Amino acid sequence: MTSPFDSKISGPARDPFAQGRPASIFIGRKASARRAVDPDVRALLREYLEDLHNGTGTRLLEELGLCQGDVRVDVAVVNGELSGYEIKSPSDTLARFPNQCRIYSKVVDRAWLVAPEKALEKSVAPEWWGMIAVFEVGDRLALRVLRPAQLNPKRDPISIAKLLWRDEALEVLRGAGRARGVMTKSRKVIWKRLIESVALDDLRAAVRAALKRRPEMIDLCQRR
C-alpha cells in the first residue's frame, strides 16, 4: 500500500522523537476548504502517527477524556507511554489552551501541541511539551516537528487513576490484593485506594493496558 507520506520531503532522520536531528516535513492530503480546519489537521496527524507507529503494538484513540471529561485529548497514542496531541488548526484560537495544557500536564507522559507556527510562538506550553507546526505546501497540508516532547516531570496520580473505569480500577486493586472494603464504594473512594496501594509506574502501566483493551481503540498493528 502507498504510504500517505510518499510525497514527504525528508531530512536525515525519519524519527521525529530523536533529539538533535533535523525535522522531516510530512506532506498530506489537500485541505477540504480554503482555510484548513480541525478535521483536516486531525486527518493528517492520524496519517502521520499511523505511519510512524505501524506494527509497533501502538494504539490510537481520539477524544480521550481527562479528569472525568474536563478536557479531551484530540489524539492519544498508547504504547509504552501515554502521549497526547492537542490540535489547533489555522481557524482555531488559543483561548482554551491554558486550561487544556494544565489538565494534559496532570496525566500524559508526553504532550504535543500541533498548530500553525505563529500559534506555537504564542502558546504557554511548558518546555517539556513537543511542538509540531502545521503549514501549507502548495495546496496540501504538512507537518514539521519543531521540538520533540520530553517526559512530563510531574504527573498527578489521582488524575491518572481517573482514566480507569470503575471495573478496571477494581481489577487493579484485586491484583494488588487491596480491593477488600471498597468493592461497593464510589469511584472517588476506589481511586483514593488505588493511589495509596499502587506505585505510580504500576498505575500508569495499568491505565495503558486498560486503554488498549477498550473496544473503541484503533489497533494500528492491524491497519495494513
Predicted regions and their residues:
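Active-site metal-binding core of divalent-cation-utilizing nuclease and nuclease-like domains
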Residues: 8-10, 25-83
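Catalytic cores of nucleic-acid endonucleases
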Residues: 91-135
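Non-catalytic C-terminal interaction segments of nucleic acid-processing enzymes
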Residues: 50-51, 130-224
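Interdomain/boundary linker segments immediately adjacent to catalytic/signaling cores
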Residues: 2-36, 217-224
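Short, well-ordered turn and helix-capping elements at secondary-structure junctions
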Residues: 64, 88-91
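Conserved N-terminal glycine/acidic-rich loop preference
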Residues: 67, 77-78, 82, 124-138
